[in-house]
Structures are given as C-alpha cells and as structure tokens.
C-alpha cells in the first residue's frame, strides 16, 4: 500500500495545490487588514446674492431673409439671317448696228450710138447650107440613149456604200460615177465605173452596195447613170 502512493499523488499536482492555497490565504489577509479612510469634511460655501440687472426684453427673432430670386434673363432675340440681295441680271446690251456703208454712185457711162449693120448682099461663093454631120456624130446620134435616174425605174431600196476606213483615216473625199442596167425583176446588172476621184479608193464599196439595190419590178432600164459622193464626215450621197 505504501509503495503505490507516489504514483497516485505526483509532485506537480501537490505543487499546484500549494500555490493555489497560498494565493487564497493572501487574498483573505489583505481583505481583513484593509484600512478604510473616511472622506474629509466639506468646507462651507459662501453665496453672495447679486441683484440682476434689468433684463433686456428678448429681441424678437427676425425670420431669416427670404432668398432673393433673380429674374431669369430674357432670351436674346435670334438675329434674322441677312436677306440675300436679289441677283440683278443685266440685260445684254444690244450690239451697235453697223453703220451703213456709203454707196458709191455708179457713174453713168455715156451711151454710144450704135450704128446699124448694113446688110451685104449674099455672095454666090458663100455656102449657106447647114454643115453635114460627120460619121462619128451620126453614130453617136444613133447610139443607145442614156437613161437618167429621174426618168428611169423607181428605186425601192438603195443602200449607201460604206465609207472606206483608209479614206476616212486620211480624210479623203471622193466621187464615183457609175452606169448600170435594171433587170425586169428589179435587180442591178452590168455595173460600169465611168469615173472615180481618186481612183482605186471607193470603187469596190460602190459595187458591193449596188448588188443590194432593188428597183420596181416590171420596169427594166438600161444605161442608168448615178453619181455617188463620199463626204469627209463619213456620209454618202447618191445623185
């Protein structure tokens, strides 16, 4: 039994119990021997009565001044845009008329007296018979007459020849004179170039266009002559 005591009561526990017991004993001792000090008696207070001066009547509390409301400034009038001055169109001044040129007076030439021509008697050696026609003139008179466009068949459509590009680039004008026949069905046949100025420039276009020409059928014609003009502005004219 004696050997188990140290195990049940260890030293740290005993030390803690002793410290707590000492603290409790100290607190009890200080509470018993505490000196109670009485407060010192209060000293007498002397009071002097003073008659208060006539109190001034309380001034009336003035209400706070009302805030002054400033009047809103009137809006400034919007200035009107300046009116545009009317545009005055000046009338064109009439051109001064040219002064008439003074007409020169034609001096009248004095009339000359014309003497009547005396008729001479006919000489027996003079030949008063009309000259005989030569063989060439007689052949021309008996040849086939040339039919003009106005008196020939009536054209239904005549396409204008195309202006050659080379001639138009060189700004060349030209004229081609053509003779042709019209068949009974109104087609153009036997085309002949009578003249071309300049040569070898417009003839091919003229022939190509005349292939498409059409005349009134049933009215054939032969030896019809027309002039085709090529103008510098690229147009053609058939005369």
UniProtKB/Swiss-Prot annotation:
Residues 70-81 are annotated as: 6 X 2 AA approximate tandem repeats of E-P. The chain crosses the membrane at residues 1-32. Its main location: membrane. Sequence repeats lie at residues 70-71, 72-73, 74-75, 76-77, 78-79, 80-81, 91-92, 93-94, 95-96, 97-98, 99-100, 101-102. InterPro entries: TonB (IPR003538), TonB-dependent_transducer (IPR051045), TonB/TolA_C (IPR006260), TonB_C (IPR037682), TonB_pro-rich (IPR049924). PROSITE patterns: TONB_CTD. Residues 91-102 are annotated as: 6 X 2 AA tandem repeats of K-P. Induction: 2-fold by hydroxyurea treatment. Residues 148-239 form the TonB C-terminal domain. Changing residue 176 to I: In strain: ECOR 60. Residues 33-239 are periplasmic. GO terms for cellular component: cell envelope; cell outer membrane; membrane; outer membrane-bounded periplasmic space; plasma membrane; plasma membrane protein complex; transmembrane transporter complex. Residues 94-104 have a biased composition (Basic residues). Residues 128-151 have a biased composition (Low complexity). GO terms for biological process: cobalamin transport; colicin transport; intracellular iron ion homeostasis; intracellular monoatomic cation homeostasis; protein transport; receptor-mediated bacteriophage irreversible attachment to host cell; siderophore transport; transmembrane transport. Keywords: Bacteriocin transport, Cell inner membrane, Cell membrane, Membrane, Protein transport, Repeat, Signal-anchor, Transmembrane, Transmembrane helix, Transport. Residues 55-162 are annotated as: Disordered. It is found in: Cell inner membrane. Changing residue 133 to P: In strain: ECOR 16, ECOR 31, ECOR 46, ECOR 50, ECOR 52 and ECOR 60. Residues 105-118 have a biased composition (Basic and acidic residues). Interacts with outer membrane receptor proteins that carry out high-affinity binding and energy dependent uptake into the periplasmic space of specific substrates such as cobalamin, and various iron compounds (such as iron dicitrate, enterochelin, aerobactin, etc.). In the absence of TonB these receptors bind their substrates but do not carry out active transport. TonB also interacts with some colicins and is involved in the energy-dependent, irreversible steps of bacteriophages phi 80 and T1 infection. Belongs to the TonB family. Homodimer. Forms a complex with the accessory proteins ExbB and ExbD. This is Protein TonB.
């Amino acid at each position: 039994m004696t050997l188990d005591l140290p195990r049940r009561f260890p030293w740290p526990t005993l030390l803690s119990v002793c410290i707590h017991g000492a603290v409790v004993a100290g607190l009890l001792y200080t509470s018993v021997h505490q000196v109670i000090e009485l407060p010192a008696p209060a000293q007498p207070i002397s009071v002097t009565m003073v008659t208060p001066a006539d109190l001034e009547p309380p001034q009336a509390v003035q209400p706070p001044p009302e805030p002054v409301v400033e009047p809103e400034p009137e809006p400034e009038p919007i200035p009107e845009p300046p009116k545009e001055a009317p545009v005055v169109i000046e009338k064109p001044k009439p051109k001064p008329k040219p002064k008439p040129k003074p007409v020169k007076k034609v001096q009248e030439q004095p009339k000359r007296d014309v003497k009547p021509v005396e008729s001479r008697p006919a000489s027996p050696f003079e030949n008063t018979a009309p000259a005989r026609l030569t063989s060439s003139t007689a052949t021309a008179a008996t040849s086939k007459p040339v039919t003009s466009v106005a008196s020939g068949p009536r054209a239904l459509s005549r396409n204008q020849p195309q202006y050659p590009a080379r001639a138009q680039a060189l700004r060349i004008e030209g004229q081609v004179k053509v003779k042709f026949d019209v068949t009974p069905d109104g087609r153009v046949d036997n085309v002949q170039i009578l003249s071309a100025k300049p040569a070898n420039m417009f003839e091919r276009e003229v022939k190509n266009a005349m292939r498409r020409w059409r005349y009134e059928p049933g009215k054939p014609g032969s030896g019809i002559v027309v002039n085709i003009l090529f103008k510098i502005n690229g147009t053609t004219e058939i005369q």
